[in-house]
């Protein structure tokens, strides 16, 4: 005998596509994926940089190792944490939906692509990928804030 949980009163049925796009809990709120990838970056970047400074490894990338470390800790790690916080906070402040599912996943992939570009791409590509996330997130947050009508 199988039991099923009845749907919540007044709940609309969920389309299969929506379940696929929004069903993975990590992609339901902005802080979840961004905090995870930021923590992974810190766990990889700090030991790698220390190893490079001690001469144990040679880093071949678009920028010098000292600049890369400073840049990734400030504009990689910190930006990931701040973007995750703000996407979640704007939803809490306004009650309106911020990116989730595939849209949130695309923002995370863009952040990851910028981190990998330091190693795999020429400097101009690295620079463009690194710069483009913040304006995109700013526009997303501005649209949600304006739609909410909150004047504070």
Located regions from the model:
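Hydrophobic alpha-helical transmembrane segments of multi-pass integral membrane proteins
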Residues: 1-152
């Amino acid at each position: 005998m199988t039991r099923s949980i009845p749907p919540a009163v007044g709940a609309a049925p969920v389309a299969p596509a929506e379940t696929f796009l929004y069903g993975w809990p990590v992609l339901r709120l902005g802080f979840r994926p961004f905090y995870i990838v930021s923590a992974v970056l810190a766990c990889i970047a700090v030991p790698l940089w220390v190893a490079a400074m001690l001469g144990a490894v040679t880093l071949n990338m678009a920028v010098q190792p000292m600049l890369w470390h400073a840049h990734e800790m400030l504009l990689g790690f910190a930006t990931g944490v701040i973007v995750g916080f703000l996407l979640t906070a704007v939803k809490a402040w306004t009650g309106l939906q911020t990116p989730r599912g595939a849209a949130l996943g695309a923002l995370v992939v863009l952040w990851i692509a910028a981190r990998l570009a330091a190693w795999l791409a020429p400097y101009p590509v690295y620079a463009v990928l690194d710069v483009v996330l913040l304006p995109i997130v700013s526009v997303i947050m501005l649209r949600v804030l304006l739609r909410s009508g909150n004047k504070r």
